[in-house]
């Protein structure tokens, strides 16, 4: 048989083997899809029941259903390993196997897997049920939604906002801290067992594309793209930041620095994530009709149902389908109030089996009107790819899923669209001033959040990678917040806090970079869809409603789900394979030009040194080595606790004896910041149970003077080695060393005297010997005057010579 015949037979055999493996894999996946549909639905339904009615029974039901689903996935993942990916040619089959071969959390031992589920459920419950009570009336308590969020959205009272901001983090963040520490360890273990560097790397894997010619994309490339696009966005953000700072100075003149960072609790919501609610304080041309249509919605008696029906009309107008009847029957669109505890954070649900729902405690505001479009965008995506195999029913990447609803929000927010649905009056006229008002409102929501998103995820990536030690989480968090976002903590937070976990997405295990990538995608999509809609004019004026051409272009991409690489899906819509910030910058170009003109006489950027509590802070410097030498002790958290307790004692004593007031200051009321390794820090004091009431520095100084010696004694230091900068040393005796100083001085003086006497004695003896020797060697005839008959002493009787003293 010829060589070519052998080669042909070999190729046939290999093809047959591959065909057999692929056929077996297809059969396996068909069986998996059928079984997964039922188990996933039961698990999702149990999770929905818990999120809409938080009870112990529903927690247990959710855990049981989740355990069954996890066990099934673990078993199927093991079976999927039997099919080598390199021998699979069919891309659809290959992608499904690739997804299933990822073990996820099932790679952990049974005990660790259960512990991780318990941690996740507990964090979710703490977040959703956390409440803050009035210190003066413990029966008056507020949940995050609507109570605390209402304060953070609308209050102009600096101290009330500070109370809400700090109390949420103190009550919820501190509870979450030990759980989040465990979560990081277990998630990292899971990720590494799945062949990722850490959990952040595991999350970035959602963007990875391998083996698809020129459409490949690496996890490292995501980091590079995010960083370089952020640098392009920074100039616009810095000018927005400077403009907002100037307006906040008008509202809070004694609390803002004209060159400093923005206090975190003044930025429109609990986290400073979206600055939308700052619009009323920052509107450039207030005499123009208000483009925030909240009042119009209230006046026209809109409710949650109307809001979502209007969102549905928008999607239908571009050729996308209506919501299903089951959607309207099963969704929870309003807060049930005291009837049951619910997770109020807006979420869209694809439970499987054609069951799509939204959970949202909708309020009648323009912000929630746009949020409804966002959440319904998720549902449209879910419905579009429902025909895909189970494992490919997802967005091309997580950012795509978030972007779909945001595209619609860009159009729904335009004055043109708001006029068309009766929320702006028919005689509303657009001009340069209304254009700037509109773009500023959009920028507060869109541009203002980008550094927040980037910094949060960068911090988490560093934590998962081990680049931030656990005992420096909060220190690094606020350093990065100052440097990257230009936002400062209104009060210092130590390592008992867990401020990142006070955000829903962190405590509920969502990756966050999706909200950064989605923002870039949404403007790329918007530009492409506006072209399909034959829009002419600036991008920010485009409204794609009623354009079925734009809708069809979008729908073609949505239907792909995860069956094609996201780079290919992006290219199909926008003509490019990568993220591009240009459409976003084009959209905001008129605003950027206006902001630069407005900021001509303002400082653009921020100093990271300033803090809102600086004026009332006292700096402390401690010199342990110079004071105690080899007996110096280590300065650690226990010493800080002792210091805070000592100051609290001084405050109690001062207020009782000088002001005749019994105020029970505690160590938690002494706030320490800027702790440096060479032992220096700042502190200030707040009233018990009221962080917004800072005790004036002058009062604290008086209390310190009054108890200075007691504080010194607690640390075995004196006024020179325990310095309160700005407070003069007291007249009280310093801390006595083990041996009295006068004894030491006396001993030194006596030693010097004795040494002096000894030196004198030996010097005298030495000099006498020298003189005698000189006398003996002198020529006896040298000075004789012979004419005078001088006596020759050499012949005199030596007995007459007296010994010299």
Swiss-Prot record:
Q: How is it modified after translation?
A: Proteolytic cleavage by ADAM17 generates a secreted form. Also cleaved by serine proteases: TMPRSS2, TMPRSS11D and HPN/TMPRSS1. Phosphorylated. Phosphorylation at Tyr-781 probably inhibits interaction with AP2M1 and enables interactions with proteins containing SH2 domains.
Q: Which residues carry this modification: Phosphotyrosine?
A: 781
Segments forming domain Collectrin-like:
614-805
- Region Disordered: list its residue ranges: 772-805
Which region is the signal sequence? 1-17
The topology of this chain with respect to the membrane is: Single-pass type I membrane protein
Cysteine pairings via disulfide bonds? 133-141, 344-361, 530-542
- Can you tell which superkingdom this protein's organism belongs to? Eukaryota
- Which residues face the membrane's Extracellular side? 18-740
Q: Report the EC number(s), separated by commas if there are several.
A: 3.4.17.23, 3.4.17.-
Instruction: Show the catalytic activity.
Output: angiotensin II + H2O = angiotensin-(1-7) + L-phenylalanine; angiotensin I + H2O = angiotensin-(1-9) + L-leucine; bradykinin(1-8) + H2O = bradykinin(1-7) + L-phenylalanine; neurotensin + H2O = neurotensin-(1-12) + L-leucine
List the Cytoplasmic topological domains.
Answer: 762-805
This protein's assembly is summarised as:
Homodimer. Interacts with the catalytically active form of TMPRSS2. Interacts with SLC6A19; this interaction is essential for expression and function of SLC6A19 in intestine. Interacts with ITGA5:ITGB1. Probably interacts (via endocytic sorting signal motif) with AP2M1; the interaction is inhibited by phosphorylation of Tyr-781. Interacts (via PDZ-binding motif) with NHERF1 (via PDZ domains); the interaction may enhance ACE2 membrane residence.
PANTHER family annotated for this entry?
ANGIOTENSIN-CONVERTING ENZYME, ANGIOTENSIN-CONVERTING ENZYME 2
Protein name (record): Angiotensin-converting enzyme 2
Q: Which organism is it from?
A: Pongo abelii
What's the gene? ACE2
